[in-house]
Regions:
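Intrinsically disordered, low-complexity
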Residues: 1-98, 160-166
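Peptidoglycan cell-wall recognition and remodeling modules
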Residues: 80-166
């Protein structure tokens, strides 16, 4: 039974091929007299053509694999539950962000209070500036943008985190 390598492993292999073939192409660019040599010219030109083709194919594979990996990451992030999405977006401010989101929406992505929507109850203007979405991750990322733009404080929100004593 043959094991199929993961897209990440395949990407690593293709990146190694890109580096190798770029090195070969660079060698012939830096040693162009070799391409015109009566003794080695035909073989050098053939090797340069092969490396150029391999390089183009590997670069295409790298682009395709990166697209696949981005799609996998996107699907994984879209499926995150609210707590995990908030912690992914806010990192070291996770605890504070969870407190604010709990107070604002009880961690419900569909929460609505007038014009205020989502986990962090962002208004229409804030959603226009910082984004919004239907998933917990989209909403958490938008709220994090707002948080950073406000100087990394919670002044835009009605609810504030309770800071633990240091």
């Amino acid at each position: 039974m043959q094991i199929t390598p993961t897209p990440a492993a395949r990407l690593k292999r293709q990146l190694a091929i890109v580096r190798k073939e770029q090195s070969v192409v660079r060698f012939f660019r830096d040693h162009s007299p070799l391409l015109r040599s009566p003794e080695h010219g035909a073989a050098a030109r053939a090797e340069l053509r092969r490396s150029t083709r391999r390089l183009a194919a590997a670069q295409k594979n790298v682009a395709d694999l990166r697209r696949v990996l981005r799609a996998q990451t996107s699907r994984r992030l879209e499926a995150l539950p609210p707590k995990a999405a908030i912690c992914d977006a806010f990192d070291r401010f996770c605890g504070q962000a969870l407190q604010v989101a709990w107070c604002e929406s009880r961690l419900q992505t569909t929460a609505q209070n007038g014009q205020y929507l989502g986990l962090f109850q962002m208004g229409a203007y804030a959603r226009e500036l910082y984004g919004h979405g239907s998933t917990a991750h989209d909403q958490a990322v938008a709220a994090h943008r707002y948080f950073v733009a406000s100087g990394r404080d919670w002044s835009p929100w009605s609810c504030k985190p309770v800071r633990e004593a240091s």
